[in-house]
Curated annotation (Swiss-Prot):
Binds 1 zinc ion. This is Transcriptional repressor NrdR. Negatively regulates transcription of bacterial ribonucleotide reductase nrd genes and operons by binding to NrdR-boxes. The keyword Transcription regulation applies. It comes from Coxiella burnetii (strain RSA 493 / Nine Mile phase I). Belongs to the NrdR family.
Length: 157
């Protein structure tokens, strides 16, 4: 690592500590040339797949956009911030676990709907209405029927 004071290449680590709940390493370093000390922080770079949009464009995964979509669907619903954050982390974990460089926005949308279905059925229908572009009340009715059939199947098991 280069010294930020004299640009020398040789530095030594004096102290290392885990910070940010173990997700980051704080290192205290000393330049071997000018003896100045400085601090560096290291975090693992965990690449998430790029998202392939319906029109074929590709964009970086945006965690804030995911969170905003969940928050919008769950607005005025009895779901805690912790539950929302857990859902966000589950979705991110599934994205990473898939192990691909790119995933379709449709696949990601289905993941979001699965999480919402488990959290709150009203939020699920809200999100589905936008995601699937419901045009009329019949589309809502069909989605609610599909949801009820899934519930019945899971209760019968």
């Amino acid at each position: 690592m280069y010294c930020p004071f004299c640009n020398a290449e040789d530095t030594k680590v004096i102290d290392s500590r885990l910070v940010e709940e173990g997700t980051q390493v704080r290192r205290r370093r000393e330049c071997l040339k000018c003896q100045e000390r400085f601090t560096t922080f290291e975090t693992a770079e965990l690449n998430l797949p790029r998202i392939i949009k319906r029109d074929g464009r590709r964009s970086a995964f945006d965690e804030e956009k995911l969170r905003a979509g969940l928050l919008k669907a769950l607005e005025k619903r009895p779901i805690s911030t912790e539950q929302i954050e857990t859902a966000v982390q589950r979705i991110i974990h599934k994205l990473r676990a898939r192990g691909e460089c790119e995933v379709s926005s449709q696949w990601l949308g289905e993941l979001v709907m699965d999480e919402l279905r488990a959290l709150d059925e009203v939020a699920y229908v809200r999100f589905a209405s936008v995601y699937r572009s419901f045009q009329d009340i019949n589309a809502f009715r069909d989605e609610i029927r599909r949801l009820q059939k899934q519930q019945k199947k899971s209760h019968d098991k």
